[in-house]
């Protein structure tokens, strides 16, 4: 008998007390939370439910922020590129940036912490050759080289918390005060924040869980003068800086800091950039310092008899949950927003906490809950997409956020959430405490490794980008597939070549000369030799997009010999190419029902002699396979997430690992239906991922099979 209560968190507000109690019963919620812009009703403190209180370590105390303007949080910003036409060039610092969001920091030594760069040469402009005119807000370069480009990198105070600004703009809030972001890392605010936290805990005895949002630096989020989003990087570190922090960094690493280590030519070290040594040093420093201070807060929380939960997002930069420092914080739980399977695994794969929680969509905001809105559609898509990943690695709880009042006019939505809550509880009871059956071990190889586990190709949280959906689809497919998935970096291979011995298949996915494929790391023969040796001795390799892409020593794809495919960059147009014959009857394509969707695909890819082309379009290879020694490789130009493409990736992994013989084990012949086996628990489930009825043949672990018809979205549980 499945549980009918528990493992669910519900939001509330002062104006929905009876409705909260009613929905707690319907949804089986055992925890209640507040949200940004809401207050917790006293009446609900006596319900017996666990009470979460959202706690902002860096805002919601403007009195302190205004009294200590020197300890307001800061961000490194680079101006646009400006071309000099004569010896003098004036560059406006705040052009394109909301002056409600940021204010130029002139309090600290600008000649020490700012940087003017000649972008035509990459050279630093001497500090004697420029000055800042505060009345105009411009840096004036007095000895510019005509027709060279210049930029200014400067520090700015974050005078309106970016998340508060986003919430205010999205919800059209009126008559409110902008919340200023203060820096808990700095001495006065550090001391004050610990006292403030202890006082809060003492004044809120009814609160069981402090839901920290978060520790302590906002991911990079900038808005322009029209309050439109200008720049976003969910992993961005550029708002985790101050002279105080940077001086500490200098002492630790033993070399002087440069703004360019953060600015990175205006790319701000986004995850497509191959990270520099200096940036990796800075990340490591931030991880240690953030963990140290976060632990102080968690210790106070525990002393006050409460649990400490961290929200995975907003001011989370430096926590890095997949790195060793995270466990030292001592958190009880992590909660994060679930946008798809990948972002579910971002939460559920975190170690070092007692439980994890996923906040599901839609968020109860007016952008979804309005007269013509369809929250049921969004909720269905969110649940069905995330469910695949939950079945591989369950979170321990689910919840929702926002304004509960908005949902009350949508009875179908309330019913659907009730169904989801019941289904989740059943799923959790059946899957908990065991690792589901894994066919093979797969390693995603890039410059970042485990620090960006499940977040590869993600610019903003789970949002579509035309330029990367063909690659992000690989990660999404893996999030719910029966593989043991790990994320390794090129540095990992250099430090420990034996790391590949436990792996069946390596996947390298992305555009050339990005961190996802490696860039100039391929000039190091230790890397290319290690991968070749791995495959030659029987390993599998799957390359998607421009794997190992970097022009060097006669190749663009540095593993072209292994992959059997190369890119025509123009340098080899003089060579004729004769291998264009397609082989559609391959194991990998056996379940396809239509032409393969490669998303954006890739132009100008051709195959070497001996390579077996599975799909080429207008003499551009989209999919090919190759034998290399005892091993095998698969090339795919792109693979957006879909159920059919998920099956293609599944078969690609099996084929590259010589695993064709294990295909019919815990397997569904219909790719819209998937099988997950929990052998230790003696159970397996079959899940219909679509909104239509499905028919399929299900294979058990011993190869025996049975026919099955399934209702839309249905999940069926069986004993092994």
Language-model segment annotations:
Residues 9-10, 15-50, 196-213, 326, ...:
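Catalytic domains of carbohydrate-active enzymes, especially glycoside hydrolases
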Residues 221-224, 231, 405-439, 479, ...:
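Extracellular ligand-binding/catalytic regions of CAZymes and related secreted enzymes
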Residues 44, 62-65, 197-198, 208-215, ...:
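Hydrophobic targeting/anchoring helices
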Residues 69-328, 346, 432:
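Polysaccharide-binding and catalytic clefts of secreted carbohydrate-active enzymes
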Residues 1-23, 27-30, 160, 164-174, ...:
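Boundary/entry segment of secreted carbohydrate-active catalytic domains
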Residues 462-487:
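Short helix-loop-beta junction
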Residues 518-594:
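A glycine-rich, often tryptophan-bearing local segment used as a flexible ligand/cofactor-contacting loop or short
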Residues 494-501, 523:
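Short amphipathic alpha-helix with an adjacent loop that forms part of the alpha/beta core around
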């Amino acid at each position: 008998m499945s549980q009918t209560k528990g493992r669910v968190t519900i939001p509330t507000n002062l104006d929905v007390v009876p409705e909260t109690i009613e929905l707690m019963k319907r949804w089986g919620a055992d925890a209640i939370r507040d949200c940004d812009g809401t207050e917790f009703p006293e009446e609900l403190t006596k319900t017996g439910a666990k009470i979460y209180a959202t706690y902002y370590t860096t805002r919601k105390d403007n009195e302190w922020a205004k009294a200590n303007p020197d300890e307001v949080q800061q961000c490194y910003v680079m101006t646009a590129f400006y071309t000099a036409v004569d010896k003098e060039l004036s560059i406006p610092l705040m052009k394109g940036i909301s002056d409600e969001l940021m204010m130029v920091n002139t309090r600290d030594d600008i000649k020490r912490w700012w940087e003017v760069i000649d972008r035509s040469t990459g050279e630093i402009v001497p500090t004697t050759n420029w000055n800042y005119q505060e009345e105009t807000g411009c840096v004036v370069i007095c000895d510019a080289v005509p027709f060279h480009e210049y930029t200014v990198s400067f520090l700015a105070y974050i005078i309106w918390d970016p998340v508060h600004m986003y919430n205010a703009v999205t919800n059209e809030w009126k008559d409110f005060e902008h919340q200023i972001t203060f820096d808990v890392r700095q001495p006065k605010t550090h001391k004050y924040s610990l006292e403030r936290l202890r006082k809060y805990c003492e004044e809120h005895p009814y609160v069981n869980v402090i839901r920290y949002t978060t520790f302590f630096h906002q991911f990079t989020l900038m808005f322009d003068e029209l309050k439109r989003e200008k720049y976003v990087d969910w992993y961005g570190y550029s708002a985790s800086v101050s002279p105080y922090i940077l001086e500490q960094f200098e002492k630790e690493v033993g070399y002087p800091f440069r703004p360019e280590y953060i600015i990175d030519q205006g790319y701000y070290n986004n995850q497509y950039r191959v990270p520099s040594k200096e940036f990796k040093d800075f990340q490591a420093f931030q991880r240690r310092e953030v963990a140290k201070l976060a632990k102080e807060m968690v210790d106070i929380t525990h002393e006050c008899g409460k649990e400490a939960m961290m929200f995975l997002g907003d001011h989370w930069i430096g926590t890095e949950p997949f790195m060793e420092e995270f466990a030292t914080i001592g958190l009880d739980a992590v909660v994060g927003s679930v946008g798809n399977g990948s972002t579910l695994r971002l939460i559920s794969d975190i170690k070092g906490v007692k439980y994890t929680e996923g906040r599901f969509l839609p968020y109860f905001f007016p952008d979804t809950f309005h007269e013509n809105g369809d929250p049921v559609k969004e909720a269905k898509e969110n649940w069905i997409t995330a469910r695949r990943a939950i079945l591989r690695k369950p979170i321990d709880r689910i919840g929702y956020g926002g304004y509960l009042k908005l949902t009350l006019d949508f009875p179908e939505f309330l019913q659907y959430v009730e169904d989801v809550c019941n289904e989740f509880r059943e799923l959790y009871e059946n899957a908990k405490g065991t690792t589901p059956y894994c066919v093979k071990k797969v390693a995603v190889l890039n410059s970042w490794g485990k620090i960006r586990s499940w977040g590869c190709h993600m610019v903003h949280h789970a949002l579509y980008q035309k330029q990367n959906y063909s690659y992000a689809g690989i990660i999404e497919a893996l999030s719910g597939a029966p593989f043991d998935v790990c994320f390794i970096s090129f540095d990992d291979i250099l430090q420990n070549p034996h790391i590949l011995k436990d792996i069946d298949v390596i996947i390298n996915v992305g555009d050339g000369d990005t961190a996802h494929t490696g860039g100039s790391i391929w000039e190091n023969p230790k890397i290319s030799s290690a991968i070749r040796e791995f495959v030659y001795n029987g390993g599998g390799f799957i390359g998607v997009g421009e794997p190992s892409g970097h022009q060097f020593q006669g190749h663009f794809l540095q593993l072209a010999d292994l992959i059997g495919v190369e890119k025509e960059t123009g340098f080899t147009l003089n060579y004729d190419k004769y291998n264009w014959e397609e082989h559609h009857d391959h194991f990998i394509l056996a379940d396809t029902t239509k032409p393969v969707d490669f998303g954006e695909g890739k132009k100008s890819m051709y195959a070497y002699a001996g390579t077996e082309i599975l799909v080429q379009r207008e003499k551009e290879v989209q999919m090919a396979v190759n034998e290399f020694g005892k091993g095998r490789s698969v090339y795919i130009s792109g693979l957006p997430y879909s159920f059919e493409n998920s099956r293609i990736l599944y078969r690609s992994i099996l084929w590259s690992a010589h695993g064709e013989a294990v295909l019919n084990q815990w397997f569904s012949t219909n790719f819209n239906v998937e099988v997950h086996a929990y052998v230790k628990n003696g159970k397996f489930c079959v899940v219909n991922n679509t909104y239509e009825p499905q028919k399929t043949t299900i294979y058990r672990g011993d190869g025996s099979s049975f026919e099955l018809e399934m209702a839309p979205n249905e999940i069926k549980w069986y004993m092994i």
